[in-house]
Each structure stands twice: as C-alpha cells, then as structure tokens.
Amino acid sequence: MKALTARQQQVYDLIRDHIEQTGMPPTRAEIAQRLGFRSPNAAEEHLKALQRKGVIEIVSGASRGIRLLMEDETGLPLVGQVAAGEPLLAQQHIEGFYQIDPSLFKPGADFLLRVNGMSMRDIGILDGDLLAVHKTQDVRNGQVVVARIEDEVTVKRLKKQGNMVQLLPENCDFQPIVVDLREQSFTIEGLAVGVIRNGDWI
C-alpha cells in the first residue's frame, strides 16, 4: 500500500473526523471548503488518489459516498521534529501513519523518521527522506543508527571504543560527532533499516 502525501493525509483526516462528529462522510464541496480547494473537483481528485492507494472506497452515485478502508493509527508512525528532552515516539512528534508493511524491512521497522540535512548523502539518505528504523539498542560498530546526544537526535554511522563514541557522517562536508560517555548523555534510539525517498513509497 502506498504512503499518503501530506495533503492526502489531511483529506483522509478530515473525512475520518467528519464521520466521527456527524456520523456521515463530508461532501466534495465540504472538503473543498474546509481545506481551501478551488472547487469540489479538486477534492474529487484527492479522493480518487486515496482510493488508488487503498485507504478509501468511493461509492458512485452518492454525494457522501465515501467509505474508509483503513483503521486509524495503523501502519508505521512518522516522527517529525523532536522536542528537546521528550521521547522520540511521544504523541506530539508523530505526524501521521504510513500504510507500509514493517516486514518489508529486515529487521522489521518500528517507525519512520523524517531526515533533516545532507550529512548521510553519500549512502543515499537525503534531506526530506523517510528513514525506516528498527527500535533497538543492540547495535554494532559500522551500522547506521538513530542516536540521541543530550537533546539532539541524529542519524550517523556508529563507531564506539571504550567510553568514546564517534558518529560518522557520509558526506565530506560534515565532521564526525564525538561523544564522551563519561560526560554526555547518549542513547541509541534505533537501527536504520531502509529509506523511502522524499515520502514516496514505491
């Protein structure tokens, strides 16, 4: 099943919320008005895209003919910006849920993290990509990990020796991050197991 774009997720959330509040789906005109589309036709195009992705069914011949096919909050949570001092998977950090089978990744993915920056460019992890992450602290030197240093979350290649950790970039424009475990707070949040390019699941 394909991931939803941010706009498609908005349309889906609106449909779900409207059903919860009124007991019925919104019309195309109501969707267009609520989300600022120029016309109901624009809403219709988004609905067709959602149907192609398998999350709704359009029932022909009815102005409110929309049926949700996916349950809320299923799939892999997408983690966006992480606030200092808060758990990575805190509810306020989750931007949405992507309908992706975790078993497509080895080991299985537990969440997606939006990549910020180009420090891992040379191994194909680019700014804006979604990184599939297996939540574990059991990692080895040389693996690409999601790590938290103090209150900062970063994606780097791990090199640990004694009380010293180096987090190595894959881009010569960036310097390694050196962590002294005797002086700094350091946590492994997970192991990188795959990449979804710019939010497009293919």
UniProtKB/Swiss-Prot annotation:
CDD domains: S24_LexA-like. It catalyses: Hydrolysis of Ala-|-Gly bond in repressor LexA. Homodimer. Keywords: Autocatalytic cleavage, DNA damage, DNA repair, DNA replication, DNA-binding, Hydrolase, Repressor, SOS response, Transcription, Transcription regulation. The gene is lexA. The keyword Hydrolase applies. InterPro entries: LexA, LexA-like, LexA/Signal_pep-like_sf, LexA_DNA-bd_dom, LexA_repressor, Peptidase_S24_LexA, Peptidase_S24_S26A/B/C, WH-like_DNA-bd_sf. The record marks A84, G85 as: Cleavage. The keyword Mitochondrion does not apply. This is LexA repressor. Belongs to the peptidase S24 family. It is an enzyme of class 3 (hydrolase). Represses a number of genes involved in the response to DNA damage (SOS response), including recA and lexA. Binds to the 16 bp palindromic sequence 5'-CTGTATATATATACAG-3'. In the presence of single-stranded DNA, RecA interacts with LexA causing an autocatalytic cleavage which disrupts the DNA-binding part of LexA, leading to derepression of the SOS regulon and eventually DNA repair. It comes from the Bacteria. GO terms for biological process: DNA repair; DNA replication; negative regulation of DNA-templated transcription; proteolysis; SOS response. Disulfide bonds: none annotated. It comes from Edwardsiella ictaluri (strain 93-146). Its EC number is 3.4.21.88. Pfam families: LexA_DNA_bind (PF01726), Peptidase_S24 (PF00717).
